[in-house]
């Protein structure tokens, strides 16, 4: 909800020239939100929390430019989280592959399926966010839309892996 308010605020200042410097991004608010989150909806509500605080504190004030920079940092936070969760699930998949008793519906290992899934997901994320960005060509708001999309979808994938995509 907060990130949508952030995008609407950017639309309100759209005609203004973005002169703000990027704020100092601190992931603490997002980390705290995630620690207190109840379920997937709670986790989703945390996306953009630190980015909004960062943009509010930006030199020159809340602007499209500051929001874009801060959301890019939030994307980096969730990308790192995704990489950590992916490594955990990959390790679990490797362990399960060692225990495979031949009951799989095909001869492809769980680890290989995980890699295939993640590669396909990256293509999906990048295409989806490029499409969303394309709808706003001609202005800086498109950059914010793009990085917000990247952060949101990356966070969703991290949550999916963290909440145990293997169903165990």
Language-model regions, residue ranges each:
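Positively charged n-region of N-terminal signal peptides that target proteins for export
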Residues: 1-5
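Cleavable N-terminal signal peptides
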Residues: 7-8, 18
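A broad, structure-centric signal for solvent-exposed, well-ordered loop/edge residues
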Residues: 8-9, 168
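N-terminal signal peptide c-region/cleavage motif recognized by signal peptidases
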Residues: 13-17
């Amino acid at each position: 909800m907060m990130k949508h308010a952030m995008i609407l605020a950017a639309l309100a200042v759209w005609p203004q020239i973005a002169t703000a410097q990027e704020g100092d991004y601190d992931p603490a608010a997002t980390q705290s939100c995630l620690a207190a989150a109840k379920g997937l909806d709670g986790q989703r509500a945390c996306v953009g929390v630190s980015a909004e605080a960062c943009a509010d504190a930006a030199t020159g004030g809340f602007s499209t430019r500051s929001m874009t920079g801060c959301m890019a940092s939030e994307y980096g936070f969730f990308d790192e989280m995704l990489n950590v969760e992916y490594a955990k699930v990959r390790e679990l998949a490797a362990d399960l592959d060692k225990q495979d008793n031949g009951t799989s519906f095909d001869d492809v290992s769980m680890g290989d399926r995980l890699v295939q899934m993640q590669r396909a997901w990256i293509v999906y994320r990048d295409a989806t966010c490029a499409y969303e960005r394309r709808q706003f060509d001609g202005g800086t708001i498109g950059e914010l839309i793009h990085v917000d999309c990247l952060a949101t979808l990356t966070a969703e994938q991290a949550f999916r892996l963290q909440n145990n995509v293997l169903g165990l």
